């Protein structure tokens, strides 16, 4: 979706640049994942992604397109319209994460991962990586959300099936809608 980059990411990129995250802003590109199955499930799934990071970032739910009885191109065009609207909404939520300060980002990340029931081993590893890289000083919900993107990368390195990775990514995208202040508490939490 290179031709749509400016339309979809313009405001988000400007905020990233204003916060000194120019490298990230220059790498991001909107993308689409198209998944179909031959196991009797008569639908295809289309989902919005942010490409350009180490691992694509899933930023919303999947839009299903029923393809039994010979679906037509119009069915997919309708799904792409829904996906485009969802993408804009999700990028807006991602931008809002930049405005949410976290006093205890490691605790917040741990609580969010636990709340979303993310795989414990990979989540603990991602939390440790974040803590080594940034410590436990003040941060933003955006920084923590981006650090959480290590979890699918770790799972992929462990040869997790694509189906499980897709479910994990969809679940992680729910973090865009959380009230992060509820998770930013001083008391340490174990996973």
What are these regions (language model features)?
Residues 3-191:
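Intrinsically disordered, low-complexity regions enriched in serine/threonine
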């Amino acid at each position: 979706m290179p031709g749509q980059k400016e339309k979809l990411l313009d405001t988000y990129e400007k905020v990233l640049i204003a916060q000194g995250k120019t490298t990230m802003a220059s790498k991001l590109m909107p993308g689409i994942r198209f998944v179909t199955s031959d196991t009797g499930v008569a639908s295809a799934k289309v989902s919005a992604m942010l490409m350009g990071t180490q691992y694509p970032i899933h930023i919303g739910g999947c839009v299903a397109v029923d393809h039994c009885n010979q679906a037509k191109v119009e069915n997919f065009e309708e799904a792409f319209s829904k996906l485009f609207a969802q993408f804009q909404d999700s990028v807006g939520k991602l931008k809002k994460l930049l405005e949410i300060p976290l006093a205890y980002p490691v605790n917040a990340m741990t609580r969010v991962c636990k709340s979303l029931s993310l795989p414990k081993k990979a989540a603990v590893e991602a939390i440790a990586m974040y803590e080594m890289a940034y410590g436990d000083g003040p941060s933003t919900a955006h920084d923590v959300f981006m650090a959480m993107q290590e979890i699918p990368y770790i799972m992929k390195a462990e040869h997790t099936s694509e189906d499980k990775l897709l479910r994990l990514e969809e679940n992680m995208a729910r973090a865009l809608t959380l009230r992060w202040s509820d998770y930013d508490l001083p008391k340490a939490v174990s996973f």
